Regions:
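A cross-taxa feature marking solvent-exposed loop/turn segments within ectodomains of secreted
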Residues: 58-60, 471
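N-terminal export/assembly segments and adjacent metallocofactor-ligating motifs
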Residues: 2-19, 24-27, 35, 39, ...
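Long, low-complexity segments enriched in small/aliphatic residues
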Residues: 611-692
C-alpha cells in the first residue's frame, strides 16, 4: 500500500509525499504558482500571500507555500476568487513601491515586474503618500534601495540559515518594518552576494554592476568558476569584449545555486592589468615585442643555458595547458615540473588527492573532522554545504587548527600534528565519536599539507581514516580540500616531477645553486622572484602580476573566461568551461602558445588542434573525457615517499588574504574595496584585518 498522498490540482491528479506543501504539489502537476517570499532552499515564511490558492471546502484562499497537502485534496489555482485575491495582494504590494523601473538595475529580470504584469491590475486606488525608507549601508558589494523592499525576508533567511552570519534582520512592525544590518555595517559573509539573486525586487542589487548594462544587452555564456577548487557553475555576461557580471547556475551536485562573493564580483579584474602582447626584458626593462622575437629569445636562452629547464604551474591554469606544457617538457628532456606551487605534499593514486566523499556526499555524513583547513574561506560554497548538514542535526564537528568562526559549531580540539597523533592513538575523545559514526569523514586542507612535514600529516590522517572506519566498500570519508582550480587537473595529467625530477622546493633550490638556469612560470604568480636567483624566467599568464614583474620573457595568455577548457574540481569532477569573451590584443590560448613554442624550439608537439590534444590527453587520463561525472578513484594509499618527522608547529592558515589570492583578484578594484572594508571592521574590534 502506497503512503503517497493523492491530490488534484486544476483537474490534474498527482501523487506526492506526505508533508509536501500545496505549492510543491502544484509544481508536480506543472502548474505555476506566483510567489515572492517562498524559496525552495529557505524556510517557509508565508508573508507575501501571493501564492494564494483555493482549496475545496476551505472557507477562503490559503497560502499554498505553508499549507501541507491532505489526502484527496482538490486545489483550484485559476478560479475567480484566486485571481481576485492575487490582484488584491499585488495592489497592496505596489502601494508603497516607488515604481522606478527605468532607473532600477533589476529592470528586465524582476519578479515584481513579471508578476504585476501577469497577476495584477493596470491601475491603483491608492491616493496617499507612499512610504520612503532610508538606504542601508551594506558594504562595497550590495547596493540598497530599501523603498523598493516588499518585506519578503528572503535575505534575512538566507543570511541566518545558509550563510550562517545573521547580520541582516528586520526591525519595526507593520508599515514601519525595515530590513537592515542593525549597525549599518558592511556584510561579513563570503556568500553575501547571493541576496542579490534572492531579492525579488530591486531593493538589493549589485553595487559594482550598478547602472552599467541592461540584461538584454548582454551575451550570456554558461561556464565554470576558477576562483577556488569547488568548480561552481556560473554564467558570464559579456557586452562586446568586456565581462559585465558573473552569476551562479544551478548544479545540485556542486554549488546548488549559490556562489561565493569572490567568484561573483571578481569580474572587473578580468578587464584590468591584462597582458595583451609579448614582452622581452632588455637592459633590465620590459619592452613590448612580437611573438617570433619572444620565441627567438627563449630558443637562444635554452641553447646557451648551462643548466636545466624547469616548469611550475599556477592555480588558475587549465588542464589542457598543463598537459601541453608537460608534453613540451618531455620533448625538452626535463623531469623538473610541478603544479603544486604552494609546495603541498600530495602524491600517489588519484584517491590520495581528491575530495572522495563528494561535495553532495557531505549531506550523507554523520561526523566530521577538519584538519588544517578553514573551508569558510577556502571553499565558501562547500562550507555552506557543511552548515546545511549541521543544521539537519546529529553531526558532531571537530577541527584541528587555528580557532575561527566557521558558521557552525565546531570543537577546536588542537592546533597541530600532535592532536592528530593523539586521535590516531585513540587518546582523544573525538576518536570515539568518529569510530561510532556510521559515515565519518575528514577534510585535510592545504594548511596541513603545504608544510615540510606535509607527507607525515597526510600519513597520519590516512591512518586515522583507516582506524575509524572512514573507508569502506560503500563509503570513502577521506577528503583533500584544494584551493586551486587547476591543481587536480594538473595532477591528473601528471604535471609532477618525473624520474629524478625536482618538485617545487627542489626547483627553487636548483635555481639558487645554478643547476636550473631557466624556469617557465605558467600562471605561477605566488613564487617569490628573489627565490629563483639568476634563473631566466619565462612567464605565461593573463595578468601583469607578480610572475610577470620578475620575468625575462612574458607570453600573454587567455583568462579562464576566454577559452574552452577542462577544469577538474576538488572532488575530481571534470567540467568544461566555455569561452565567454576573446583574449585582449595578441594574447592566445595557453595550449596554442606551447604548441607554437615547441615548433620554434625544434620539439614539435604531436597535436595541431585542441581536439587532437584532448585525444592524446584522454589516453593518459580517460576519466577526463567523462564530463560532469564523479569517476570512482579507488582507495587512498600511504605515500611511497619517506614520511618526515612531524613538526610541532600549529597548522597555519593557507590563505593570508581571502580577497587577494590570485592575479585576477589582485587586479580587481572590487576585491580591494572588500579587503579594505574587512580591515576597517577588524580595526574597529581590534583585529588585524587579514586571514592569518
Amino acid at each position: 500500500m502506497s503512503d503517497r498522498v493523492n491530490v488534484t490540482v486544476d483537474g490534474i491528479a498527482v501523487e506526492v509525499e506526505p508533508g509536501t506543501t500545496i505549492l510543491q504539489a502544484c509544481e508536480e502537476a506543472g502548474v505555476e504558482i506566483p510567489r515572492f517570499c517562498y524559496h525552495e532552499r529557505l524556510s517557509v515564511a508565508g508573508n507575501c500571500r501571493m501564492c494564494l490558492v483555493e482549496v475545496e471546502k476551505a472557507p477562503k484562499p490559503v497560502a499554498s507555500c505553508a499549507m501541507p497537502v491532505a489526502p484527496d485534496m482538490v486545489v483550484n489555482t485559476q478560479s475567480d476568487s484566486v485571481k481576485s485575491a492575487r490582484e488584491g495582494v499585488m495592489e497592496f504590494l505596489l502601494i508603497n513601491h516607488p515604481l522606478d523601473c527605468p532607473i532600477c538595475d533589476q529592470g528586465g529580470e524582476c519578479d515584481l515586474q513579471d508578476q504585476a504584469l501577469g497577476y495584477g491590475v493596470d491601475s491603483s486606488r491608492f491616493e496617499d503618500n507612499k512610504r520612503a525608507v532610508e538606504e542601508k549601508e551594506m558594504g562595497p558589494l550590495v547596493k540598497t534601495v530599501m523603498t523598493r523592499c516588499i518585506h519578503c525576508t528572503r535575505c534575512v533567511r538566507f543570511a541566518t540559515e545558509v550563510a550562517g552570519v545573521p547580520e541582516i534582520g528586520a526591525i519595526g512592525r507593520g508599515e514601519d518594518m525595515e530590513i537592515t544590518t542593525y549597525l549599518e555595517a558592511s556584510l561579513e559573509s563570503e556568500m553575501s552576494g547571493n541576496v542579490i539573486d534572492l531579492c525579488p525586487v530591486g531593493a538589493l542589487t549589485s553595487k559594482p554592476y550598478a547602472f552599467t548594462a541592461r540584461p538584454w544587452e548582454l551575451r550570456k555564456t554558461e561556464t565554470i568558476d576558477a576562483m577556488d577548487a569547488v568548480g561552481s557553475n556560473i554564467r558570464v555576461d559579456v557586452r562586446g569584449r568586456e565581462v559585465m557580471r558573473i552569476l551562479p547556475r544551478d548544479n545540485e551536485a556542486v554549488n546548488e545555486e549559490w556562489l561565493s562573493d569572490k567568484s561573483r564580483f571578481v569580474w572587473d579584474g578580468l578587464n584590468t592589468q591584462r597582458l595583451d602582447r609579448p614582452y622581452l626584458r632588455v637592459d633590465d626593462k620590459l619592452q613590448a615585442t612580437d611573438w617570433p622575437s619572444a620565441f627567438d629569445a627563449i630558443a637562444a636562452r635554452l641553447e646557451a643555458g648551462s643548466g636545466q629547464v624547469a616548469a611550475l604551474a599556477g592555480d588558475l591554469v587549465c588542464t589542457e595547458g598543463q598537459f601541453a606544457l608537460k608534453s613540451l617538457m618531455e620533448k625538452l628532456g626535463s623531469p623538473h615540473l610541478d603544479c603544486r606551487q604552494d609546495g603541498a605534499k600530495l602524491s600517489g593514486p588519484r584517491a590520495n588527492y581528491l575530495f572522495n566523499t563528494g561535495i553532495a556526499g557531505i549531506e550523507d555524513s554523520d561526523a566530521l573532522l577538519l584538519i588544517g583547513t578553514n573551508p569558510r574561506l577556502e571553499a565558501a560554497v562547500l562550507n555552506a554545504r557543511i552548515r546545511k548538514r549541521w543544521l539537519a542535526g546529529n553531526f558532531p564537528i571537530a577541527a584541528i587548527g587555528q580557532p575561527t568562526d566557521l558558521t557552525y559549531d565546531a570543537e577546536f580540539i588542537g592546533a597541530g600534528p600532535q592532536t592528530l597523533a593523539e586521535l590516531v592513538e585513540g587518546k582523544h575523545g573525538f576518536a570515539d565519536v568518529l569510530s561510532k559514526a556510521e559515515r565519518p569523514m575528514l577534510i585535510l586542507g592545504q594548511g596541513a599539507l603545504a608544510r615540510s612535514d606535509g607527507a607525515g600529516v597526510f600519513a597520519q590522517a590516512l591512518a586515522l581514516a583507516q582506524k575509524t572506519g572512514m573507508i569502506s566498500d560503500d563509503w570513502n570519508g577521506f577528503n583533500v580540500l584544494h584551493t586551486a582550480a587547476g591543481r587536480v587537473g594538473g595532477m591528473d595529467v601528471g604535471f609532477l616531477p618525473g624520474e629524478g625530477g625536482r618538485d617545487r622546493n627542489g626547483i627553487i633550490e636548483g635555481c639558487k645553486s645554478g643547476d636550473i638556469s631557466t624556469v617557465i612560470l605558467y600562471g605561477a604568480d605566488e613564487i617569490d622572484r628573489d627565490e629563483l636567483g639568476g634563473a631566466f624566467v619565462i612567464y605565461i599568464g593573463s595578468h601583469g602580476d607578480r610572475g610577470a614583474h620578475g620575468a625575462d620573457v612574458i607570453l600573454p595568455a587567455a583568462a579562464y573566461t576566454e577559452k574552452q577548457a577542462i577544469f577538474v574540481n576538488t572532488e575530481g569532477r571534470a567540467q568544461m568551461s566555455e569561452r565567454a569573451a576573446f583574449p585582449p590584443g595578441d594574447a592566445r590560448e595557453d595550449w596554442k602558445i606551447f604548441r607554437a613554442l615547441s615548433d620554434h624550439l625544434g620539439a614539435t608537439l604531436e597535436f595541431d588542434t585542441v581536439d587532437a590534444l584532448r585525444t592524446v590527453m584522454f589516453e593518459l587520463a580517460p576519466h577526463l573525457a567523462r564530463l560532469d561525472e564523479l569517476v570512482p578513484a579507488g582507495v587512498p594509499e600511504k605515500p611511497v615517499a619517506d614520511v618526515t618527522e612531524l613538526d610541532a608547529a600549529a597548522f597555519a592558515p593557507v590563505l593570508k588574504d581571502y580577497y587577494f589570492t590570485n592575479p585576477i583578484a589582485r587586479a580587481s578594484a572590487t576585491m580591494a574595496a572588500c579587503a579594505e572594508a574587512k580591515r576597517a571592521r577588524a580595526k574597529a574590534i581590534g583585529g588585524t584585518g587579514t586571514d592569518g
